[in-house]
């Protein structure tokens, strides 16, 4: 008997077939919907593949057809156009998400991959707190975090804006160095404005530094960018090997598929380095604010995008071959139209141009004509201490906290406002962009913290590291690609602890100037110095205390320099002066110490009576020739400066020890108002910190940065700023406090790798208007001011030409990690 033909009831392998009357009951041509005659699975089999980037059981083994986004056909692996989940859906292989964490000491790369490719993936505006709070809703990102290396957070550079930080990540440069100081700016030398929507954005004159795609190409590698600020600009005359012109409407999935296709290219064309960028969760965070259901959905979208990338890598057997860095440029903060500071509340007429928002700047509106003559100081003065609860502080760029590295560029307008969290500063009440969320604030704010996760054969597994700055990522990427980095602001080797086998081993800085000898000499005549000290009854005995024998000097160094003598990396004439309780490096060039170092215990015992003050008891140091010494007569009343002590005399419990500190080699020039801060810090805060931390090693000294470039001024530059006195006035003072992470240990017996540091770079100014402190008790403002001006030890080194921790018995990369640490003080919403 002849078998009857089974009726067709599916569109499988029939999509876009020619219409047939015989099959009119179950059609799969492109007009069947109009006739309402499609097979039941027409939508899933024929339509969905043109809209979906995923396989499903119905699609597995499908017949090839045009216009599909990706294929689930049997030959898709050969054709290299499979959907990324083809193997897990159609071949029942374990998905990357369900795989166990890989554990291998070596790269697992397929044939043809001699070196692990590197992918840099940015999720714009992904603040670190999102991952802490919503990790269970982001399984792919959470797995990457669990299996690879991640930081608690990565600190953005200031201002915490998109273009600024993306370009910092690929150059290792601060905004002031690479020139992209904001998403909007003016350059008086170019007489041009820069904006994200303007044509000038593609003018290479705006873009400084060497982005990593150029570093790679200059050293024989290939680089591809799927959207990245700067990648479509002809920087230094060239583009990346492959790049895409930005188009925000391009689906995230299309971006991932293209990056994966780059990895399918023949070796001769395949990029060694690729970037991938998506706008979420930033776009949604701006619209709805960081704490919103919409942001959670955008995070899940971002998570699926990562999952698609990892599935695609696994399908190519590259998931344990590729090194992947997943990061963000900045965080996100909630804003409200009820939290606006209007310039019209401070000025009768707002006769200037203002970049409004979370990181405002002010300049002349008539440029270039009035650019240089604009009275910035008058603007700052009118914006200072005007309201009891003012939600911003106005700074001249040169007075901003040094940790921001935001002064040394003509594009940085002189007037800058540091705005409180969740507030905006704007011109007037016409401002409308004040709902939802924004960013740009101080990079120490928790809400501005960004994510950093890394996975691949180059990175350690299941490792959490402490926070670091995004200027360090460029060097890290160069190490993964075995490249020599271009000059940058990062500290090369400080992220070695992220890597299984670090490529670069840092070398100790070479000292330029070893100390000279200052010999104990005859007592100079008091008439020469103008100094007096009537309370000293036996001057010879007091001076003889400064003539320590070698054994006493060694003991002083053990007590006061437990981590080694700071090395001097500039040409300088100085000598070490040993006292029982402190050591100083006295400079013959600037007539004051380069640094003083001492250690105080948890139970600092102060004298029952206050020691004599500098005004009534100060004498010349007999170890310093008179012509190389400060004198009391240098401090004339009309100079508004007073001698301040680097080592406080009242830190010595006995009278004779106090006289060891009442010498001209221990004094530095201070404005009287600054001395308020300095004295309160030493009398109240230092003992408190010493109690909390079981003792402290303290190193402090002057800084000279008159050209505010973040680096120490040469002595001939300093000489230009000495007026009516032979004493140069420091622009800042630094303090470096070192203790032990384990509070049962003291700074003197702390084991290697366990040190904890807290550093400050304090602007030396003649008033305390920054804190509105003229009539305020010191306890209400000093500590907050100091926290504002916290800094990395590395910042102190750059500004002083010193090299700290020279004798630590640990790998240098661990010391660099300590030097690049920036302490954070959690700021409440004001």
Swiss-Prot record:
Q: Which cofactor does it need?
A: a divalent metal cation
The keyword Secreted is annotated on this UniProt entry: yes
Query: Which EC numbers characterise this protein's activity in its record?
Result: 3.6.1.-
Residue span, SMB domain: 7-50, 51-95
Q: Which CDD domains did the record assign?
A: Enpp, NUC
Q: How is the cofactor bound?
A: Binds 2 divalent metal cations per subunit.
Q: Which residues form the active site?
A: 162 (amp-threonine intermediate)
* Positions of short motif Cell attachment site: 35-37
Superkingdom in the source lineage? Eukaryota
Q: Which GO terms describe its cellular component?
A: extracellular region
Q: In which tissues is it expressed?
A: Expressed by venom gland.
In alphabetical order, the GO MF annotations are: ADP phosphatase activity; metal ion binding; nucleic acid binding; nucleoside triphosphate diphosphatase activity; toxin activity
Which residues take part in binding AMP?
Answer: 248, 286
Q: Which residues are glycosylated?
A: 16, 193, 236, 247, 489, 723, 742
> Known catalysed reaction(s)?
ADP + H2O = AMP + phosphate + H(+)
Q: List the disulfide bonds.
A: 11-15, 11-28, 15-46, 26-28, 26-39, 32-38, 39-46, 55-60, 55-72, 60-90, 70-72, 70-83, 76-82, 83-90, 101-147, 109-321, 337-434, 385-772, 518-575, 531-632, 533-617, 740-750
Kindly list the biological process annotations in GO that this record carries.
nucleoside triphosphate catabolic process
Q: Which Gene3D superfamilies match?
A: 4.10.410.20, Alkaline Phosphatase, subunit A, Extracellular Endonuclease, subunit A
The top EC class, named as a word, is hydrolase
* Stored PROSITE patterns: SMB_1, SMB_2
Q: How does it assemble?
A: Monomer cleaved in two subunits; disulfide-linked. Is synthesized as a single-chain protein and is subsequently cleaved to form a two-subunit protein held together with disulfide bonds.
Q: What does this protein do?
A: Hydrolyzes ADP with high activity. Shows weak or no activity on 5'-AMP, 5'-GMP, 3'-AMP, ATP, cAMP, and cGMP. Is devoid of monophosphatase and proteinase activities. Dose-dependently inhibits platelet aggregation induced by ADP and collagen.
PANTHER family in UniProt: ECTONUCLEOTIDE PYROPHOSPHATASE/PHOSPHODIESTERASE (PTHR10151), ECTONUCLEOTIDE PYROPHOSPHATASE_PHOSPHODIESTERASE FAMILY MEMBER 3 (PTHR10151:SF107)
Q: Record's family?
A: Belongs to the nucleotide pyrophosphatase/phosphodiesterase family.
Query: Per its record, how is this protein called by name?
Result: Venom phosphodiesterase
